[in-house]
């Protein structure tokens, strides 16, 4: 049962809207509990509905290219990187957009096999493999991690069915099972070598949510310059974000001393506090509390 309506993200003078609110109430016989203005907040975007995809690149020392998979998910994993002055984060969907980034990230996806086949067909897989052959680092997260292995099998038809070859950049194979892994994870990253060795021992506070098993108990794996993890929220800890960017700067012969990363937990809480304040100021909270107390 609907007890009230709320107008959200309103731009303009609420007084001009008031006659319309009265008309709405007369038509639907449900009270309007408030008009929330458009609030300039920085909160996590919905998957595939982000303005981040269309942002113009900024000039920066470090260029990070995230593959814009058709079924990309959890891409807010990389938001912390965008707050670092020395870093530009781009989302690319074609080989011609890739350029020569300092790091390629393969993000999570709602369908690993179909998105890998998409990369194979449009040439991005070959471009990523060429990047790896040139000694440049690659990081795969969740579904992107699975793509980097030798093979992906789906005997139960969970995603695509059958078996396809992976990119062959990590010595691992993935098999999808009928049960999804959902787990919170805290700790420090396992020891790795190569360009991103500074990630070794860095703290994380994240989660795993994925289909499939990849035959390793490590939270971070690597072979030469290619790295993979199932962890989402990897860069929410500023120490880990800073370690990644400093490693990339050292690879280019740049001084990493000035790299500062945002404390994402504190930053997010500040944004949600601003959202809560905006809601309280805009809504008839007494009426809302009354509805809550009375129940449906």
Regions found by a protein language model. Give the residues of each.
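C-terminal lobe/tail of nucleotide-utilizing enzymes
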Residues: 1-90, 95-102, 169, 173-296
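Short, flexible coil/turn micro-motifs enriched in small/turn-prone residues
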Residues: 103, 135-139, 161, 223, ...
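Cysteine-nucleophile active-site neighborhood
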Residues: 109-195, 201-205
């Amino acid at each position: 049962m609907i007890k009230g309506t709320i107008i959200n993200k309103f731009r303009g003078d609420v007084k001009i809207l008031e006659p319309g609110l009265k008309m709405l109430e007369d038509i639907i016989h449900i009270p309007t509990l408030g008009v929330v203005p458009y609030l300039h907040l920085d909160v996590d975007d919905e998957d595939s509905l982000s303005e981040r995809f269309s942002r113009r690149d900024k000039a920066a020392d470090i260029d990070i290219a995230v593959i814009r998979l058709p079924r990309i998910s959890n891409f807010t994993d990389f938001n912390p990187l965008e707050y670092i002055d020395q870093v530009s984060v781009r989302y690319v969907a074609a080989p011609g957009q890739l350029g020569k980034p300092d790091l390629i990230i393969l993000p999570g996806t709602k369908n690993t096999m179909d998105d890998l086949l998409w990369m194979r067909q449009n040439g991005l897989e070959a471009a990523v493999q060429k990047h790896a052959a040139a000694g440049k680092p690659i990081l795969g997260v969740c579904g992107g991690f699975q793509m980097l292995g030798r093979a992906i099998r789906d005997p139960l038809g969970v995603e695509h069915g059958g078996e396809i070859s992976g990119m062959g950049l990590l010595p691992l194979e993935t098999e999808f099972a009928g049960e999804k892994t959902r787990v919170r994870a805290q700790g420090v990253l396992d020891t790795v070598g190569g360009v991103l060795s500074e990630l070794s021992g860095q703290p994380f506070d994240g989660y795993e949510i994925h289909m499939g098993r990849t035959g390793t108990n490590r939270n971070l794996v690597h072979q030469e310059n290619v790295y993979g993890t199932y962890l989402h929220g990897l860069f929410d800890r500023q120490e880990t974000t800073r370690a990644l960017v400093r490693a990339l700067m050292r690879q280019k012969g740049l001084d990493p001393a000035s790299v500062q990363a945002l404390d994402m937990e504190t930053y997010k809480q500040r944004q949600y506090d601003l959202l809560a304040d905006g809601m309280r100021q805009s809504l008839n909270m007494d009426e809302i509390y009354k509805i809550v107390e009375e129940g449906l």
